[in-house]
């Protein structure tokens, strides 16, 4: 995987910028790495890791800030034949300890400001400050001789609905990302890709790092404070041509930053969105204000994105997009069976298990792994339907469906209506337990600045636009919706909400 992502570009254009690191959105980059420099650092880190005496395939847990060091160590471990485990710097000590123990990592790279006291005996600890010295060590490794199905990296799911579980990917995962190149990004070697997320997320590791490098393009990393208003300035300073973020950030940029159809976004060609359902009107508002298109994708840690719109796949209102060229996708019955449903019928979105981008499996979770496999298909839990032209309409997550008066209600349907209320800035819905035996639909609302917090107004608005059983019975006002470090909604937190 490391040879495919880095080695080819280093051989073809060694002096071309591979990575630009910005600490200030309005100043030149603080670090500029060529492909040759990236490869040299990665292979020297690989040699330093080999000197630690790790077993083949050993897990290497990364607990560092989102810097170039993180990216170099991730690929250095892969180049040596080890299995990096990227983690968020925002994890609590207990959360990080769980990942360390559950993964059985043999080496932990950790920054001084990210404490972790209960480290199991036998785990080697590398101070994060030492990694740059490893990148300059005298020894230089060669790429490990790995097979396509050998483990390459281990990602833990964000845990929005349950305890995190490890998703183990093979070296072929990098090859399995090829349908995204033109099926979502429309990427060329001339592009500069700016992703706003952290490296522990597959969206960032793939879209923001792996795929640009595999295409000989330039990746951009920002390490400064992430106020929504700074992104247009950084896009201009970095001369970014592709921008990737969660939908919420695009909405915040429109609200808090100065953007227009002129030069406010510099050379930007288009934006990419994934990670959560976009709020109603986002595509139209962004295009109207900036003159640029947004292209959406649907995916998951187990497969990454596999359904999308793109410069080559026109966006259809209400649909995520189409299965990327080369993907085998179907809609299967919710209650079992492997025969795909006809166009227009809602069911479980499934990807064929022959897809090279599909995970090897869940780390030490055979029972949970069995639940997502059905014959030749992998089922990730997304409800969807496919129209006669192959466009996929996402209908929510199967485990997010709310039950009200015997009916099944998708939270996204209610959210789409409530988001049109003039006092609503953001909204999320979930089934709330009000008594031991009674659950109702709850709406969690972040009000617009200066708006009155009037729950009855929200309820009346819903009653005029939704069937009675779909209307929220409780409205809870929040200063902010609960989100993961990468901006994804933590709907599980809302499900566990209890009224005072």
Task: Give the location of each predicted region.
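Conserved AMP-binding/adenylate-forming core of the ANL superfamily
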Residues: 19-67, 71-75, 92-97
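Conserved pre-ATP/AMP-binding loop-to-beta segment of ANL
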Residues: 14-17, 137-156, 162-163, 186-192
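Conserved beta-loop-beta connector loops within the AMP-binding
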Residues: 330-352, 386-389, 451-455, 490
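Gly/Ser/Thr-rich phosphate-binding loop
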Residues: 240-245, 254-316, 328, 338
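Conserved ATP/PPi-binding loop(s) of AMP-dependent carboxylate-activating enzymes
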Residues: 326, 337-371, 409
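AMP-binding/adenylate-forming catalytic core of the ANL superfamily
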Residues: 91, 243, 355, 360-361, ...
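Conserved AMP-binding/adenylation subdomain of ANL enzymes
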Residues: 175-192, 202-242, 256
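Conserved AMP-binding A3 loop
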Residues: 31-36, 152-176
């Amino acid at each position: 995987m490391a040879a495919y992502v880095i080695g080819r570009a280093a051989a073809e254009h060694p002096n071309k910028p591979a990575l630009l690191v910005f600490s200030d959105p309005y100043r030149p980059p603080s670090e500029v790495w060529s492909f040759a420099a990236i490869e040299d650092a990665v292979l020297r880190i690989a040699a330093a890791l080999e000197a630690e005496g790790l077993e083949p395939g050993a897990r290497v847990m990364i607990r560092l800030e989102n810097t170039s060091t993180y990216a170099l160590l991730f690929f250095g471990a892969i180049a040596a034949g080890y299995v990096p485990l990227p983690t968020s710097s925002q994890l609590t000590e207990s959360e990080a300890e769980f990942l360390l123990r559950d993964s059985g990592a043999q080496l932990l790279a950790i920054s001084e400001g990210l404490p972790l006291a209960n480290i199991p005996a036998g785990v080697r600890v590398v101070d994060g400050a030492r990694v740059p010295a490893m990148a300059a060590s005298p020894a230089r490794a060669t790429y490990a001789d790995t097979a396509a199905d050998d483990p390459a990296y281990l990602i833990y799911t964000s845990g929005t609905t349950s305890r995190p579980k490890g998703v183990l990917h093979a070296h072929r995962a990098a090859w399995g990302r090829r349908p995204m190149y033109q099926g979502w990004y429309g990427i060329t070697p001339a592009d500069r890709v700016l992703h706003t997320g952290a490296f522990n997320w597959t969206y960032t590791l793939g879209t923001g790092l792996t795929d640009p490098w595999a295409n000989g393009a330039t990746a951009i990393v920002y390490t400064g404070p992430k106020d929504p208003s700074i992104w247009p300035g950084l896009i201009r300073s970095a001369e970014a041509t592709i921008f990737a973020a969660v939908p919420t950030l695009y909405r915040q940029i429109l609200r808090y930053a100065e953007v227009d159809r002129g030069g406010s976004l510099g050379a930007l060609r288009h934006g990419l969105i994934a990670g959560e359902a976009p709020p109603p009107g986002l595509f139209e508002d962004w295009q109207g204000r900036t003159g640029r298109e947004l292209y959406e994708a649907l995916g998951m840690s187990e497969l990454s994105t596999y359904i999308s719109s793109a410069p080559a796949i026109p966006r259809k209102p209400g649909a995520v997009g189409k299965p990327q060229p080369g993907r085998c996708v179907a809609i299967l019955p919710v209650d079992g069976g492997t025969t795909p449903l006809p166009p227009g019928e809602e069911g479980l979105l499934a990807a064929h298990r022959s897809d090279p981008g599909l995970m090897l499996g869940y780390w030490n979770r055979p029972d949970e792994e069995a639940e997502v496999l059905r014959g030749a298909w992998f089922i990730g839990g997304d409800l969807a339907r496919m129209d006669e032209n192959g466009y996929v309409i996402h209908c929510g997550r199967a485990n997010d469906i709310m039950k009200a008066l015997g009916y099944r209600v998708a939270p996204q349907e209610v959210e789409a209506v409530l988001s049109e209320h003039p006092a609503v800035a953001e909204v999320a819905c979930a089934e709330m337990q009000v008594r031991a035996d009674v659950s109702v639909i709850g709406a969690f609302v972040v009000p617009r600045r200066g708006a009155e917090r009037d729950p009855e107004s929200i309820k009346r608005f819903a009653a005029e636009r939704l069937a009675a059983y779909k209307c929220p019975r409780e409205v809870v006002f929040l200063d902010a919706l609960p989100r993961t470090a990468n901006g994804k909604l933590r709907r599980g937190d809302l499900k566990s909400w209890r009224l005072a």
